[in-house]
Amino acid sequence: MNKQSWLLNLSLLKTHPAFRAVFLARFISIVSLGLLGVAVPVQIQMMTHSTWQVGLSVTLTGGAMFVGLMVGGVLADRYERKKVILLARGTCGIGFIGLCLNALLPEPSLLAIYLLGLWDGFFASLGVTALLAATPALVGRENLMQAGAITMLTVRLGSVISPMIGGLLLATGGVAWNYGLAAAGTFITLLPLLSLPALPPPPQPREHPLKSLLAGFRFLLASPLVGGIALLGGLLTMASAVRVLYPALADNWQMSAAQIGFLYAAIPLGAAIGALTSGKLAHSARPGLLMLLSTLGSFLAIGLFGLMPMWILGVVCLALFGWLSAVSSLLQYTMLQTQTPEAMLGRINGLWTAQNVTGDAIGAALLGGLGAMMTPVASASASGFGLLIIGVLLLLVLVELRRFRQTPPQVTASDS
């Protein structure tokens, strides 16, 4: 990576064929999951006319994802990781086929949608954990920042494209097309993933899966560095739940339906800019301090967001949050991979991802509770400034993370 450039270097896709295969598979997978994400709530709403039933499907899938992340972490540290990834993807695709066949029935089964949602949520997260644990072996630990930034861009781009395609398919062909193409896309991802090298876990003594998972918890709690990173990640995810207040704040700002879209687009746009301008992050001598400060800045942006007199200024605050949270997330990802022993990578990645999932749910619940007692403006500000106070305390308490220093990676000729 060129020291003189702030821009992200994409050369990793050229120099590392295995990472290129993962990049391609991940992009196709994100688009496929996006088609599914549009179709499931629409189908349930059409069948039941109940937002509660739609919410139940999201909750069940989220619960299955949490369990899948826990189980996937243990499996990724115990079995050959490539096999775990392929098994999870293939099994997930079978669930999508089930959703497609159910949608083609004269009277689709609501119970089948719920059960297949549990199936897909579990196996999708199983593969995610194994892939995260395998990444250092695919790109080398010195390239993790670059790999994380490219991955973030992939996720953001796919998240923008897939709902648009999903909406067009719903308008022209119905939900069965969404499910069918999601299944096809998932099986297509197996082709590039088959080219991956063998990814065996490091040798370690066999133990009961629950005991193995508890060992991961103990490592997380015993390590001030890794535990602090995970804690910051959870708080940052809680802050992103501010999106539940967008409709109410839009009324406060008297925004049109078209303008509300800017609120939802602001954070992904800011995050994409953060990933694109992450060229120098890997060369930071004090990544822990930078992570803490960028996290504090993101909380401040949320606190100021609801106080803005004009919606356009609120959008700027959200974009700033997206940028700062991207910086913090990239540093979290890189430090977590480099500071975790190889034998623990599956479990720690599973726990880190799981706390992100639960952080979002907790943040949404807290904001919903605040919204019942306060105005939307007060709720947004209270959440942002409350997290800012907690962040300042963590800045003082997490001494090892704050003082952590690293030797910046050497610049190679291919990076210049």
From Swiss-Prot:
UniProt xrefs under Gene3D superfamilies: MFS general substrate transporter like domains
Signal sequence extent: none
InterPro entries, sorted: Enterobactin_exp_EntS (IPR023722), MFS_dom (IPR020846), MFS_trans_sf (IPR036259), TM_effector (IPR010290)
Superkingdom, taxonomy of origin: Bacteria
Any one cellular-component term (Gene Ontology): plasma membrane
Gene Ontology molecular function, alphabetical: enterobactin transmembrane transporter activity
Family in the record: Belongs to the major facilitator superfamily. EntS (TC 2.A.1.38) family.
HAMAP family: MFS_EntS
Name this protein carries in UniProt: Enterobactin exporter EntS
Organism, scientific name: Escherichia coli O139:H28 (strain E24377A / ETEC)
Native organism taxonomy: Bacteria, Pseudomonadati, Pseudomonadota, Gammaproteobacteria, Enterobacterales
Gene behind the chain: entS
